[in-house]
């Protein structure tokens, strides 16, 4: 299997290298691609050093079987035809193609089969907050159809990339040394000791693009008419996102039956003993593969409502891991060139 990583120097690109090694992904040859800024950098994979090649419009992808692409929407749009020209499967981490009808949007625990129909050779990886939420919603949907979901997300700095993590750390350092944060470029405001109730650009409805992604992507992945309403907030933690989720189902569900299906669900770890201070926290889910869920309880305002809390590493399951799992599924069913 010949594999490429486009955007190898970024936070998700680096996570691809770790996950592919950890899972012993079947790679005979690995090629790393990047922009002019990262071309020439060297990274080690399974004891061997690889140099990042400049991404160009040429025949570099002619013999590539799978390309993991995490270099931003504009790069995905510009190079999609170049990458897929000779039959390479492009698994794209950007938002560029997610809502296009001829591009499947896939979370393997839910709709892996959708990846088999890809007329453009592209499979889209969903938004990180969407992935973590639907992995938890799907087992509940099997108990009773979910009508509405309301979410407040608490998203760490790493969701904005490696440079954003560095900026947050730099802000804390500056505050300790001088009393104020001087480095503010990756976020619209100081993030250290703060929360920012905006992720991505505002739309004309005053919902952000991040919040609208959750609305549309959830419906597409789950093949459902479920309606979601989200408030996405950037918080001053480094890694791992959290979400407070309110779920309205067609019929009332007992907490015990929800716990039971979540405990058995693939990709989910139940952490739910709040009387003993046991519940999911981003500090503990960082670096882990599963989505952690707890604080499961009946909603006090709606007899058909359930509320819960989840956390997950958005660079792993929210990005690189989900893409690798898609590729593993394609290999398992023999659906790669």
Report each predicted region and the residues it spans.
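N-terminal Rossmann-like NAD(P) cofactor-binding subdomain of oxidoreductases
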Residues: 1-191, 227, 260, 291-292, ...
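Charged docking surfaces used in two-component/phosphorelay signaling
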Residues: 67, 157-337
């Amino acid at each position: 299997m010949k594999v490429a990583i486009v955007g190898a120097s970024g936070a998700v690109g680096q996570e691809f290298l770790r996950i592919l090694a950890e899972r012993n992904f079947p790679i005979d040859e690995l090629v790393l691609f990047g922009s002019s800024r990262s071309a020439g950098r060297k990274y080690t994979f399974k004891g061997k050093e690889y140099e990042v090649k400049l991404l160009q419009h040429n025949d570099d992808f002619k013999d590539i079987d799978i390309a993991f692409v995490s270099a931003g929407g504009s790069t995905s749009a510009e190079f999609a035809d170049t990458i897929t020209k000779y039959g390479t499967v492009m698994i794209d981490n950007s938002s560029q193609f997610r809502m296009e009808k001829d591009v499947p949007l896939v979370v393997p625990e839910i709709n892996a089969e959708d990846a088999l129909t890809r007329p453009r050779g592209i499979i889209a990886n969903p938004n990180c907050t969407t992935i973590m939420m639907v992995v938890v919603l799907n087992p509940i949907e099997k108990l009773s159809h979910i009508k509405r979901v309301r979410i407040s997300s608490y998203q760490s700095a790493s969701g904005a990339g490696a440079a954003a993590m560095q900026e947050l750390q730099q802000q804390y350092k500056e505050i300790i040394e001088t009393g104020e944060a001087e480095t503010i470029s990756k976020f619209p405001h100081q993030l250290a000791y703060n929360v920012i109730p905006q992720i991505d650009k505002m739309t004309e409805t005053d919902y952000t693009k991040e919040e609208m992604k959750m609305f549309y992507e959830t419906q597409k992945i789950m093949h459902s008419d479920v309606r979601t309403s989200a408030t996405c907030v950037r918080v001053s933690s480094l890694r791992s996102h959290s979400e407070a989720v309110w779920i309205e189902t067609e019929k009332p569900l007992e907490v015990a039956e929800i716990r039971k299906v979540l405990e058995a669900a693939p990709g989910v770890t139940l952490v739910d003993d709040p009387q003993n201070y046991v519940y999911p926290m981003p500090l503990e889910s960082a670096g882990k593969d599963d989505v952690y869920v707890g604080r499961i309880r009946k909603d006090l305002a709606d007899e058909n409502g359930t509320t819960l809390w989840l956390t997950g590493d958005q660079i792993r399951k929210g990005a690189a891991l989900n893409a690798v799992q898609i590729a593993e599924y394609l290999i398992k069913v023999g659906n790669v060139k």
